[in-house]
């Protein structure tokens, strides 16, 4: 059997940087383009950084937890890494595509794995108009912000904003407000994964709003369009019994 070609990527955390040369000495090291699989060392940030670099080819990524938050990571063990990778279960993720137009008319494009969020930039609340598949669903939402979250991202910022947790295989997106003031009782909506969401900022010159695709931010926006990108799929590997759908299920029973 041909040895597994592994590329290693480590976050800047000391724990990850410390084990990086040891793993390269033990298993060899290839560039990400040459490798069969990429091993990300750190927390979820390291995993997201690695996945963003693989938007075009969807090369599988296996994460080992040496950071803070590790929802997308496996436990760290230096031994038996090729065997763990070969036995791993695969989760396929579909990223979101954001097109944000700022007040100057400049169009910014970015991709997100977890969520695309809009947030007020000042002490004044944001006022947002929500359009789904060309139909106005809400003329004005007064809030601190609004997000569109994927199933993989539903346990992150979306959950903190009291949004629903989505099973990883669900063909759904969560549309979740952040501190909605009016309508006060609105808690968001579930949308089909193929939905196109247009969000227009009401009075953007007086109530500025930023838009973020995961951690990539655009400020002073006038309009944002969010869609799932069907042409791109990302592959994340998990140890047996610890796959992403199981983690999401456990999260729903956590107190």
Curated annotation (Swiss-Prot):
Enzyme Commission designation: 2.7.1.23
Protein function: Involved in the regulation of the intracellular balance of NAD and NADP, and is a key enzyme in the biosynthesis of NADP. Catalyzes specifically the phosphorylation on 2'-hydroxyl of the adenosine moiety of NAD to yield NADP.
Coiled-coil regions listed: none
GO MF, one annotated term: NAD+ kinase activity
A GO cellular-component term linked to this record: cytoplasm
Subcellular location: Cytoplasm
Alphabetical UniProt keywords: ATP-binding, Cytoplasm, Kinase, NAD, NADP, Nucleotide-binding, Transferase
UniProt-annotated binding residues for NAD(+): 44-45, 114-115, 144, 152, 155-160
Cofactor(s) needed: a divalent metal cation
UniProt GO BP: NAD metabolic process; NADP biosynthetic process
EC category: transferase
Record SUPFAM superfamilies: NAD kinase/diacylglycerol kinase-like
Family: Belongs to the NAD kinase family.
Annotated TM spans: none
Positions annotated as active site in the UniProt record: 44 (proton acceptor)
A Pfam family reported for this protein in Swiss-Prot or TrEMBL: NAD_kinase
The reaction(s) this protein catalyses: NAD(+) + ATP = ADP + NADP(+) + H(+)
Protein name stated in the entry: NAD kinase
